[in-house]
Regions:
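Asp-box/WD-like beta-propeller blade repeats and closely related beta-sheet repeat scaffolds
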Residues: 98-116, 121, 126-174, 192-206, ...
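Gly/Ser/Thr/Pro-enriched helix-cap/hinge segments flanking short amphipathic alpha-helices
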Residues: 17-23, 28-32, 42-48, 431-449, ...
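Bacterial Sec-dependent N-terminal signal peptides
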Residues: 1-22
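Repeat-based blade/solenoid architectures
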Residues: 36-59, 78, 100-113, 160-173, ...
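Hydrophobic beta-strand segments that make up the repeating blades of beta-propeller
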Residues: 70-77, 121-128, 185-189, 250, ...
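Short, conserved, GDST-rich strand-edge loop motifs in beta-rich repeat architectures
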Residues: 127-135, 188-208, 314-340, 400-437, ...
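Beta-propeller blade repeat segments, especially FG-GAP/WD-type strand-to-loop junctions
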Residues: 24-25, 81-96, 135-156, 194-227, ...
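Beta-propeller blade termini
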Residues: 57-67, 86, 108-121, 140, ...
Length: 718
């Protein structure tokens, strides 16, 4: 017995020793010097009852603000001030918020980085929301004035430059939409209302919505003019995710907005600098219902931008039963009748594909197939190569400070509204909300397997700490060749994850860096038979901005066959046989205007036939609600359209056709004519009650003629 125990002990030690090291290591605040915690007090004057996004948290931006070659950390705070931490090397940071002039007293949300005056020094644009007073909701543009003892000093010039937007703003993005050489500004907004956010009301598409986003055109001198309506930005939404990229590969950058609640997402296709058109229904068949953060990146190395949008579907059956709201068939019909596209409460991963014609793009949604559809109450998705193997992995921040999505709590609050006034209800609900436990969840990370699927590797890679995490961003903070992570948590000290890929793995990397105010649009790296592409925009995930140093993992390959750096002005710098393990500086003098080849139409196996003489059949199915009578059905059994069968019914050697009718609709035979086209003949037998559910043409009696076999049934009644 003792020998057996000893053997088991030795085996367990051997197994423990053989376990690979974690990819990420969570650093202690004492080690990094970063003590920031985005705290909210849940007071009587401002809380979830009078601000719908009270628990949505803040963002983080990573950028080299003082030009020392190390990315610094800027956190946004809600009821606490934003904080700036300068990177002192070796993953240690120093709080210089006061010296930098970045202390805030407003409810700050998203943050992005730009160089608004083209002086080569990064500036910060910070969105605000929360407070009912519009004066406290003016967005901030912190323009860098000087370096003082190595500390960047900023001044808020939002009002002077015309971008002090006083809406409820979540995030913003700078990009040159019209290719005139300066950065324009998209500001993503939401409204603040508790009721009716999931009611299928008539869409507001003429700029009249309180939650309409805003677009500011750069006048060329660093000042901006709001021109949303003129440019077609006219549809309401509750924007939580914002991504910029050339979605349809026409050379012009587009805008994707993921919207919360019933509001459909928006895909603003750039009309060659003249404005924008929302074409999401033409590109995607369905979307996430509660669209949170989003990211645009190429997940399968085909040089096409794919899209991830996260939602709040729990992983477990227990979690889903506690959280998922009721969506009745009648409400689903109302939503469809009001013009809303199909939406589902889960993460969606939209895989880009070429359309049939040149310039066309379509998306196939593969979230469930890829294994990333359910990650619970999620916020910020980031697609990046964290293990340097040449494939972009997926990190998702998770958690919500009060579990107000619990169905029992929702039923309780609904009952309160039935019997009390709004004021009485609010007084009673505030203490009840404070009693609700925090939905502290581990953040999730998935390894890209390279076959359109992802492995959940949170435990294996060391991402296991439960938290209420919101904004997150990546950067190589210690310049060792792998991407570290910074996470802004609610009512908890922020996370800094050190990436250990350079120490624990043998994969190579390559980095590309902007040269002062030269703006990169995208970079393509060809290595080992694969082509990777990264869009250079910093706004990713949720309320956050990543480093402007573009990172590629090369796996086992010690060099890249070629590197193509496309600048914002359209010129391309090409490099060949580039050694790994280095950071390339952009050299605009080497960039040349590319010859843009016209895309050839894809040769398809089939072509559409616009009309065939004699085939004018119109199927009719009476509306019927299956779920009203059978609520546990997995899908409708009615409304499935006509049955079709082909075969030679008249012995002339040509295939004829039979189309089965709906309930009380007779089927029709179409006989093919030698000269082309068809002639219709009614079915000369009395059909039984019900709908024709199947049909087959075959020689039943061996006389050489096609016979018609029909089945009847249906789910409609009476």
């Amino acid at each position: 017995m003792i020998k057996r125990i000893a053997t088991l002990y030795i085996c367990s030690l051997a197994c423990a020793c053989s376990q690979p090291d974690k990819l990420f290591r969570l650093l202690e605040a004492e080690q990094t010097g970063v003590q920031f915690a985005n705290t909210v007090s849940e007071g009587d004057s401002l809380n979830i009852l009078n601000y719908v996004y009270y628990y949505n948290g803040g963002g983080v931006a990573l950028a080299d603000l003082n030009g020392d070659g190390l990315d610094d950390i800027f956190f946004t705070g809600n009821e606490t001030s934003c904080r700036l931490y300068l990177n002192e090397g070796s993953l240690h940071f120093r709080d210089v918020t006061r010296e930098a002039g970045l202390e805030t007293r407003d409810w700050c949300t998203g943050v992005t980085v730009t160089d608004v005056n083209s002086d080569g020094r990064p500036d910060l644009y910070v969105c605000t929301a929360g407070y009912p007073d519009p004066e406290r909701r003016k967005n901030k543009l912190f323009v860098q004035q000087e370096l003082r003892d190595g500390i960047p000093v900023f001044s808020d010039e939002a009002t002077a430059r015309g971008v002090a937007d006083s809406s409820y703003s979540t995030q913003a993005a700078f990009f040159d939409f019209d290719k005139d050489g300066d950065q324009d500004l998209y500001v993503m907004n939401h409204a603040n209302q508790r009721e009716s956010v999931n009611t299928p009301a008539t869409k507001k598409t003429h700029g009249e919505g309180a939650s309409n986003d805003h677009f500011y055109v750069n006048d060329g001198n660093g000042r901006f003019t709001e021109q949303s309506f003129r440019l077609g930005i006219n549809t309401e939404g509750y924007g939580l995710g914002l991504a910029i990229g050339d979605v349809n590969d026409d050379g012009w950058e587009d805008v994707y907005v993921s919207n919360d609640f019933i509001y459909n997402d928006l895909l603003w296709i750039n009309d060659h600098g003249k404005g924008f058109v929302n074409l999401i229904d033409s590109f995607m068949n369905h979307q996430s219902y509660n669209g949170m953060g989003c990211d645009l990146a190429d997940i399968n190395n085909d040089s096409r931008l794919d899209l991830i949008v996260v939602d709040m579907l729990p992983e477990t059956a227990e979690g889903r039963k506690k959280m998922i709201g009721d969506l009745t068939w009648s409400k689903a019909e109302l939503i469809e009748q009001a013009g809303y596209a199909p939406q589902y409460m889960r993460n969606t991963l939209q895989l880009a594909a070429y359309g049939r014609n040149p310039g066309e793009t379509t998306f196939c949604e593969i979230g469930q197939m890829a294994g990333i559809a359910a990650t619970d109450w999620s916020w910020g998705p980031l697609l990046a190569d964290f293990d340097n193997d040449g494939w972009k992995d997926l990190f998702i921040s998770n958690g919500y400070y009060r579990d107000i999505g619990d169905k029992d709590f929702i039923d309780y609050t609904n009952n309160l509204f039935m019997f009390r006034s709004r004021e009485e209800t609010d007084r009673q609900m505030i203490p009840e909300i404070r009693k609700q436990k925090a939905r502290r969840l581990p953040n999730r990370i998935f390894r890209n397997k390279g076959d359109l699927s992802f492995d959940p590797v949170s435990y294996q890679w060391g991402i296991t700490q439960p938290s209420c995490s919101n904004g997150t961003a990546y950067s190589d903070l210690d310049n060792d060749g792998d991407l570290d992570l910074v996470v802004n948590n609610l009512n908890e000290t922020s996370f800094i994850y050190e990436n250990l890929a350079n120490k624990n793995l043998n994969n190579n990397y390559l980095k590309i860096k902007n040269n002062n105010n030269i703006s990169i649009s995208r970079v393509r790296v060809h290595a080992g038979g694969h082509t990777q592409e990264v869009v250079a925009h910093r706004e990713r995930g949720f309320m956050s901005a990543v480093s402007d140093v573009i990172h590629f993992g090369l796996g086992e390959f010690a060099r890249a066959d070629s590197v193509e750096i496309t600048l914002a002005n359209g010129k391309v710098q090409k490099l060949y046989q580039v050694a790994s393990g280095q950071t390339i500086q952009v050299n605009p003098a080497e960039a040349k205007t590319p010859v843009r080849l016209e895309k050839e139409a894809i040769q398809t196996w089939f072509s559409a036939v616009k009309a065939i003489t004699g085939l004018e059949y119109v199927h009719h199915d009476d509306p019927f609600s299956d779920f009203q009578y059978q609520p546990l059905l997995p899908h409708r059994l009615t409304g499935q359209g006509p049955v079709l069968a082909t075969g030679d019914l008249d012995g002339d050697g040509l295939d004829d056709c039979f189309a089965g009718g709906g309930k009380a609709q007779p089927g029709i035979i179409y006989l093919q004519k030698p000269e082309g086209g068809f002639v219709s003949r009614p079915l000369e037998v009395k059909a039984p009650e019900g709908k024709c559910t199947d049909a087959c043409i075959f020689d039943a009696n061996g006389d050489g003629l096609g016979d018609l076999y029909l089945t009847f049934g249906g789910n409609e009644w009476p």
